[in-house]
């Protein structure tokens, strides 16, 4: 529905409405796939299973440029075609799930459990029962609609004005920028915290789980992954076309290299972890690779001499991501320990991941809109031409070919703003790496959760500390031993 609305939109507001529906469905699909992967795999196979839905990136990298070029300016068709491509691609999984449901009904014990669940959620005939069961119990309390609404208002009011303010300083003094910020910080955020801590029966943020450092720091890493990526990647396509003189096909493929390399690296790592059964060393290594990658991106950020450097930097960025993005998800799922908490922790991880995307997009958009117009105007010294270069860069590059004085000036402006974005990303790599030291390093068992494995082998203690079968005693350990243990 979202893609149909977007493809037929004639105004920004209609397109935004379609984007909301699209994002709602997309997030649901991603969460469902990750929960299925987690529910159908043992912990030591979890990383490999998590990468299965991402394997198409290996193909998408090389065909996306051709598709983008073929679509051209027919943007409505470019969006609308996914309204039937995506449902068709879901048919094999749907058939598989229906077949498994049919097999479950053939087993008497499983059939009784399914019938019991169906009876619990059977639609009541009376309105009063429907209101109590579906509206109040499910919608308000179990789905925590009020908490979800307050969180959306909070992040929307805080983040959107960063980009809407544009490159004009006077915009920050206008009501349509100030009022949303005040509502977000002063009203919505406190209300969200109060609701989640005092009134919500099943809060979006399970505070009892977040107290575990294995979960807390994994969530912080999830936030930083997309936040840092957006610093370099949000406007990379525009930089490649305008500032590096890449074609549409080439720019599309280059921006996809990150996903291509990360999926290949992560899949190979997933096979290796089946036997190695540890995640923390690989997460630390992958995060450290981002330092080197962003350092290269600070250097290679514009003109034709940066072509190979940007490709190498993005490949290195994807190489590092393959070691720690999905691996961190496997780590936090291991920290969840019980089957009941697995879906909650996975959903919380993906939610934090998307919050990082939102904040990263807002900050990168703010830097772009605040710095780039000023830099272009300073170099071109022509307000009309500067407005065209900033507002319609892809039209501008056809009017002023590569090597012309105007194009050179705009290229320098793009190089400057991309340097700022990459430096910001490089700075935030520091807390990202520090958080990897604070993760737990559980041994991934041949079971869906550590709770199941603990009942058979006793591999971890109930208070969340490591098993004490290697000589470590949490009751008699010295401060030095505790400090060293924190990073293991």
Label each PLM-derived region with a short phrase.
Residues 2-146:
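Helix-loop-helix hairpins in multi-pass membrane proteins, especially solute transporters
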Residues 55-60, 222, 259-261, 355:
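Short hydrophobic/small-residue motifs within alpha-helical transmembrane segments
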Residues 78-95, 148-154, 180-188, 383, ...:
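Symmetry-related core transmembrane helices of the 12-TM Major Facilitator Superfamily/SLC fold
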Residues 70-85, 166-176, 280-281, 369-428:
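A membrane-interface helix-boundary motif in multi-pass transporters
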Residues 156-251:
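Membrane-helix boundary/linker segments in multi-pass transporters
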Residues 98, 395-488:
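Transmembrane-helix exit segments and adjacent C-terminal regions of multi-pass membrane proteins
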Residues 4-6, 15, 65-74, 162, ...:
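Interfacial helix-cap and linker-helix signal at transmembrane-aqueous boundaries
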Residues 13, 29-32, 44, 252-381, ...:
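C-terminal module of multi-pass small-molecule transporters
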């Amino acid at each position: 529905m979202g893609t149909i609305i977007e493809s037929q939109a004639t105004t920004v507001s209609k397109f935004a409405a379609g984007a909301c529906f699209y994002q709602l469905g997309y997030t649901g699909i991603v969460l469902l796939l990750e929960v299925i992967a987690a529910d159908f795999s043992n912990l030591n196979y979890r990383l490999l299973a998590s990468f299965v839905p991402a394997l198409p990136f290996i193909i998408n990298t090389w065909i996306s440029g051709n598709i983008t070029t073929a679509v051209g300016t027919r943007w409505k068709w470019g969006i609308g075609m996914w309204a039937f491509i995506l449902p068709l691609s879901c048919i094999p999984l749907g058939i598989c799930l229906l077949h498994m449901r049919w097999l479950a009904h053939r087993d008497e014990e499983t059939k009784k459990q399914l019938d019991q669940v169906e009876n619990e959620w059977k639609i009541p005939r009376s309105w009063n029962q429907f209101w109590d069961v579906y509206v109040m119990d499910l919608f308000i309390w179990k789905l925590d609609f009020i908490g979800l609404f307050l969180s959306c208002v909070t992040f929307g009011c805080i983040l959107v004005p960063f980009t809407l303010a544009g490159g004009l300083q006077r915009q920050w003094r206008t009501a349509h920028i100030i009022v949303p910020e005040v509502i977000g910080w002063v009203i919505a955020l406190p209300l969200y915290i109060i609701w989640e801590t005092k009134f919500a029966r099943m809060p979006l943020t399970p505070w009892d789980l977040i107290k575990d450092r294995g979960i807390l720091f994994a969530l912080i890493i999830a936030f930083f992954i997309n936040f840092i990526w957006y610093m370099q990647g949000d406007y990379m396509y525009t930089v490649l076309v305008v500032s590096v003189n890449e074609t549409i096909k080439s720019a599309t493929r280059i921006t996809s290299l990150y996903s291509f390399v990360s999926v290949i690296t992560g899949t190979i790592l997933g096979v290796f972890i089946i036997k190695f059964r540890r995640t923390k060393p690989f997460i630390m290594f992958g995060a450290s690779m981002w330092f080197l990658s962003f350092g290269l991106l600070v250097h290679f950020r514009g003109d034709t001499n940066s072509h190979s450097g940007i490709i190498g930097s993005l490949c290195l960025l994807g190489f590092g991501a393959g070691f720690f993005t999905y691996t961190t998800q496997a780590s936090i799922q291991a920290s969840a320990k019980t089957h009941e908490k697995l879906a909650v922790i996975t959903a919380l991880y993906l939610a934090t991941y998307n919050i990082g995307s939102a904040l990263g997009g807002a900050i990168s958009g703010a830097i772009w809109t605040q710095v780039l117009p000023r830099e272009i105007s300073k170099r071109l010294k022509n307000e009309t031409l500067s407005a065209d270069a900033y507002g319609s860069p892809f039209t501008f590059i056809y009017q002023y070919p590569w090597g012309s004085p105007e194009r050179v000036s705009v290229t320098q402006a793009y190089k400057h703003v991309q340097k700022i974005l990459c430096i910001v990303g490089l700075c935030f790599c520091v807390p990202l790496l520090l958080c990897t030291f604070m993760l737990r390093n559980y041994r991934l068992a041949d079971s869906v959760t550590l709770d199941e494995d603990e009942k058979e082998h006793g591999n971890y203690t109930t208070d969340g500390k490591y098993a004490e079968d290697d000589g470590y005693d949490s009751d008699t350990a010295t401060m030095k031993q505790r400090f060293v243990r924190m990073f293991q």
